[in-house]
UniProtKB/Swiss-Prot annotation:
HAMAP family tied to this protein: Ribosomal_uL16_arch
Keyword vocabulary terms for this entry: Ribonucleoprotein, Ribosomal protein
Alphabetized NCBIfam families for the sequence: PRK04199.1-1, PRK04199.1-4
GO BP annotations, alphabetical order: translation
Disulphide bridges: none
Family under the similarity heading: Belongs to the universal ribosomal protein uL16 family.
Stretches assigned to coiled coil: none
InterPro entries, alphabetized: Ribosomal_uL16 (IPR047873), Ribosomal_uL16_arc (IPR022981), Ribosomal_uL16_CS_euk_arc (IPR018255), Ribosomal_uL16_dom (IPR016180), Ribosomal_uL16_euk_arch (IPR001197), Ribosomal_uL16_sf (IPR036920)
Cellular component per GO, a single term: ribosome
PANTHER family per record: 60S RIBOSOMAL PROTEIN L10 (PTHR11726)
Lineage, opening ranks: Archaea, Thermoproteota, Thermoprotei, Thermoproteales, Thermoproteaceae
Protein name: Large ribosomal subunit protein uL16
Organism, as annotated: Pyrobaculum calidifontis (strain DSM 21063 / JCM 11548 / VA1)
Pfam families associated with the record: Ribosomal_L16 (PF00252)
Source organism superkingdom: Archaea
Length: 178
């Protein structure tokens, strides 16, 4: 059965559903890497600028959208900036388990299936819950790569279901992804 559209899961309804020990069949997190580019602290010391992709609204982002955004931004930065010239971190983790009450949809169905109201549903995916002002992506880089970093974050933002903004600032002293 195909995945439901993201609009079905974009809004936050109810408390987070995260306790895997009580959830049978909870899907695994399908994001292989959260840190890309140069990850060593010694090499990152040369980066003087920080760009952040910040959420503007409260909402949920499915792990497929996070992975698509991570891949497109990482590939763009690797192609135009080079692996040694940036550090990219995905700052949110999809802990919330999404549920789906599957309904039958058959060819030639002349009557709609109604089903039980407020049914609990079975695990169908995962999502990260974000609040306004929360950092989704964090990039450290040198000032000469500013245009490429902003373009990479713009492309990543196009994959996400909630509005975001890009914040660029000088790197703080000893602070990591906040």
């Amino acid at each position: 059965m195909p995945a439901r559209p993201a609009r079905c899961y974009r809004r936050i309804k109810g408390p987070p559903y995260t306790r895997e020990e009580y959830i049978h069949g909870a899907p695994m997190i399908q994001i292989p890497k959260f840190d890309m580019g140069t990850t060593s602290a010694a090499a990152r010391a040369a980066f003087t600028m920080v760009a952040k992709l910040v959420a503007e609204e409260r909402g949920q982002i499915r792990m497929q959208a996070l992975e698509a955004a991570r891949q497109i931004s990482s590939k763009y930065l690797t192609k135009y900036v080079g692996d040694a010239n940036y550090y990219l971190r995905l700052n949110v983790v999809p802990h919330h388990v999404l549920r789906e009450n599957r309904m039958l949809a058959m060819a030639g169905a002349d009557r709609l299936q109604e089903g039980m109201r407020l049914a609990f549903g079975s695990p169908a995916g995962r999502a990260a819950r974000v609040e306004p002002g929360q950092v989704i992506f964090y990039v450290e880089f040198k000032p000469e790569h500013l245009a490429h970093v902003k373009e990479a974050l713009r492309r990543a933002a196009s994959k996400l279901p909630i509005p975001t903004r890009i914040v660029v600032e000088p790197k703080g002293d000893g602070k990591t992804a906040s």
